[in-house]
């Protein structure tokens, strides 16, 4: 068993690597500036958590104390101008403190790219960070990867949103740059296997998927899997600045993230030294479309990061909306003066003869669904407790946790996939925090238009629904109580 530190635990790589490390019996310590962001993650109670800032001397020393292997999974790309300098300063501090703590090995996820091609500042920063980490004197395994194909990866999210939302794409030259994308599961496998890799000093290992393609082929391959028809028109000139503004306009990516990504697309990022295939013979990299399919299989509410904890208990309705990893989440929270069991009973008895809120609206939606070839609004629900797989009108129970939560998946005809989730969390001795999440994973531009067209209707329907649940729970007027 190794004592392992994972930095960047709240990120899409670190958060998925931790379960693999725990499965193999390692003691895992995670570090974050704000540990409350980790509290709702499924592995939170299985790890040691330290609140620390990797830019502060004492914080880094405390995080590395007693550690055998440290994963360095952070960089400052989204922090504005000067990120290159901050990356190197942070790496130097981490290396110095690792040496003082007698850390055996640092494992760092870097980026592919050959210096002879004139690397962009972002790619150059990633590689120079590896050299600065090597100053600590112990082993450094630097895994250089191309675009990672998986939910949360910024290059993949850019490909996803552009392909989903733009039927006819005007493509600059960078769209035809050669790349070697790698599936998220393969990256995690390489990272986990690097703990026991035999090697000394600074080892640079290039990792990639099984295919070398272009960014344009990444988009057309994604479209093929999603059943979307896309037309690409090549143009001779479209500056990185204009391209990044276009990406920012079309996708949820912030401009501070979009620009370094777009600028980096002019560099070929392919494996030149395939030694990883010999060093890790147990890992057989996926092809691009297999990696995309794996990412799409993960397109469900559980793939999203938890909602941020509310700063205060809401006396009235609090609404939060995010667009992340291909899913839009509209979250409503309300304090209810009732036990969490009463709140759970209230939302698990919705549907059937009890109905919902604004029943006429649900009936109208059911009639439209029936006309489009869907099942329509079936007045049905189990007579007792709901369980996974049960039908509740035009919803299917996808998951239920007794006394805590209910997740329903829509069986309506939709340009995408939709879910409705309710959770009850005890907030104090006399009340419960009721949370209602509506999720939608739009398919193509039609799905995006559908979501925004219905937004004006969402407010009265979903606001009324959560208030009705709160009223039923507070009054004790739910079906289960009436049967006692």
Report each predicted region and the residues it spans:
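N-terminal Rossmann NAD(P)H-binding glycine-rich loop of SDR-like oxidoreductase domains
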Residues: 2-26
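NAD(P)H-binding glycine-rich loop region in Rossmannoid oxidoreductase-like domains
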Residues: 36, 40-103, 112-115
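Substrate-positioning beta->alpha
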Residues: 90, 154-155, 174-195, 203
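Conserved beta-loop-beta element that borders a ligand/cofactor-binding pocket
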Residues: 110, 131-154, 158-161, 165, ...
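Mid/C-terminal beta-alpha module of Rossmann-like enzyme folds, strongest
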Residues: 194-260, 268-332
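Beta-strand/loop substructures that line and gate deep hydrophobic ligand-binding cavities in soluble
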Residues: 259, 410-457
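Glycine-rich portal/gate segments that line the openings of hydrophobic small-molecule binding cavities
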Residues: 335-344, 348-415, 468
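A conserved amphipathic terminal alpha-helix motif
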Residues: 447-484
């Amino acid at each position: 068993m190794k004592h392992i530190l994972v930095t960047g635990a709240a990120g899409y790589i670190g958060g998925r690597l931790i379960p693999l490390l725990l499965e193999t019996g390692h003691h895992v310590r995670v570090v974050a500036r704000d540990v409350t962001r980790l509290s709702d993650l499924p592995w939170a109670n299985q790890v040691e958590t330290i609140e620390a800032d990797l830019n502060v001397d004492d914080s880094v020393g405390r995080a590395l104390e007693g550690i055998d292997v440290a994963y360095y999974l952070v960089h400052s790309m989204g922090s504005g101008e000067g990120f290159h300098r901050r990356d190197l300063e942070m790496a130097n501090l981490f290396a110095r403190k690792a040496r003082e703590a007698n850390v055996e090995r640092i494992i760092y996820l870097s980026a592919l790219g050959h210096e002879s091609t004139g690397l962009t500042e972002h790619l150059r920063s990633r590689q120079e960070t590896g050299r600065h980490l090597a100053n600590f004197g112990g082993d450094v395994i630097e895994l250089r990867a191309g675009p990672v194909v998986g939910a949360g990866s910024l290059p993949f999210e850019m490909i996803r949103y552009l392909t989903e939302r733009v039927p006819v794409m005007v493509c600059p030259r960078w769209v035809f740059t050669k790349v070697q994308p790698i599936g998220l599961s393969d990256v995690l496998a390489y990272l986990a296997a690097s703990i026991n890799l035999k090697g000394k000093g600074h080892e640079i290992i290039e990792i990639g998927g099984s295919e070398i393609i272009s960014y344009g082929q990444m988009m057309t391959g994604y479209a093929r899997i999603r059943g979307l028809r896309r037309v690409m028109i090549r143009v001779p000139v479209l500056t990185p600045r204009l391209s990044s503004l276009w990406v920012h306009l079309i996708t949820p990516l912030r401009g501070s993230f979009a620009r370094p990504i777009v600028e980096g697309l002019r560099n070929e990022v392919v494996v030149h030294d395939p030694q990883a295939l010999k060093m890790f013979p147990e890992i057989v990299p996926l092809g691009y479309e297999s990696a995309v399919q794996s990412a799409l299989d993960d397109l469900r509410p559980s793939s999203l990061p938890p909602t941020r904890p509310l700063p205060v208990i809401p006396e009235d309705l609090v609404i939060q909306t995010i667009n992340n990893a291909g899913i839009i989440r509209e979250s409503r929270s309300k304090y209810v003066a009732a036990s969490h069991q009463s709140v759970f009973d209230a939302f698990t008895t919705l549907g059937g003869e009890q109905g919902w809120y604004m029943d006429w609206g649900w009936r109208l939606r059911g009639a439209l669904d029936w006309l489009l070839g869907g099942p329509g609004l079936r007045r049905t629900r189990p007579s007792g407790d709901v369980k996974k797989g049960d039908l509740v009108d035009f919803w299917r129970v996808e998951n239920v946790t007794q006394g805590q939560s209910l997740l329903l998946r829509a069986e309506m005809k939709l340009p995408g996939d939709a879910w409705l989730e309710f959770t009850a969390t005890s907030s104090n001795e006399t009340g419960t925090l009721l949370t209602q999440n509506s999720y939608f994973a739009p398919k193509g531009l039609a799905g995006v238009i559908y979501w925004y067209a219905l937004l004006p209707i969402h407010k009265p329907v979903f606001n009324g629904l959560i208030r009705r649940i709160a009223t039923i729970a507070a009054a004790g007027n739910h079906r289960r109580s009436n049967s006692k």
